[in-house]
A protein has these predicted regions:
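Catalytic-site neighborhood detector that most strongly recognizes the C-terminal catalytic loop/helix
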Residues: 92-95, 184, 191-216
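Basic, Lys/Arg- and aromatic-enriched nucleic-acid-binding interface segment
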Residues: 1-45, 49, 124
């Protein structure tokens, strides 16, 4: 049986994260947080389900910026600016590739919640819990998935939450990075894909979303 993979939109994620967890078990909240780490890192579950303090470091980034020269109107002076960036370093278990993922504010907030040592749950448990959360979030949009049986393909309408699993996090992260306008060569440095071609096969943005991305980025279509 073959099933088309899905990804969660920004709107889906907002609903997913805003579910009232008091109506579910503590395990559901942990599963949701682990899943969201997978989204923000765009890693496989074997990597995002094991992140701890040893994987996290803070880097000091120095850059040169031009600022107005207070003593010479219309001129600028170069100034060195420093900023700290929290980074997750992972050696991917499947490929052995080393990747470094800058922490977004959302990701850092989750890591801080667990004192930078994420709890671990079995994959099957995460899969069960995140489906519960997806249902509670109202992710009941009908998705036509393709099932193959005996060499015959058939489209089967299925509620979206039933298709959420641990790998959805990685696909969601990669797709949202792409739709945000991030360069594919930068994305593969994070995801560990071997080439942009492999990444593009992985991204699940539909035609309308791709058109929206292109027309926002390029004035050619104005």
């Amino acid at each position: 049986m073959d099933i088309d993979s899905i990804y969660l939109t920004k709107e889906d994620l907002e609903k997913f994260q805003n579910v009232d967890m008091t109506k579910l078990s503590p395990g559901h909240e942990i599963a949701r947080d682990i899943f969201m780490v997978g989204v923000w890192t765009a890693q496989r579950v074997s990597d995002y389900n094991n992140i701890g303090r040893d994987d996290i470091q803070t880097l000091t980034i120095r850059s040169i910026v031009d600022e107005p020269d207070p003593e010479n109107v219309g001129k600028t002076i170069a100034k060195i600016v420093t900023r700290e960036v929290t980074v997750i370093n992972i050696r991917q278990k499947k490929t052995g590739a080393k990747v470094a993922i800058p922490c977004s504010s959302d990701l850092k907030r989750i890591l801080e919640k667990y004192n930078f040592q994420m709890p671990h749950l079995e994959d099957q448990v995460i899969n069960r819990y995140i489906k519960d959360i997806g249902k509670a979030a109202g992710l009941t949009e009908i998705v036509n998935i393709v099932k193959t049986n005996g060499g015959e393909e058939k489209e089967v309408p299925t509620e979206k939450y039933k298709l959420i699993h641990t790998h959805t996090a990685r696909r969601t992260g990669a797709t949202l990075m792409y739709l945000s306008g991030m360069d594919v060569y930068d994305i593969i440095k994070i995801t560990g894909h071997t080439s942009p071609v492999m990444l593009r096969k992985y991204i699940k943005a539909d035609e309308l979303e791709v058109v929206e991305k292109i027309t926002e980025k390029y004035k050619y279509f104005d």
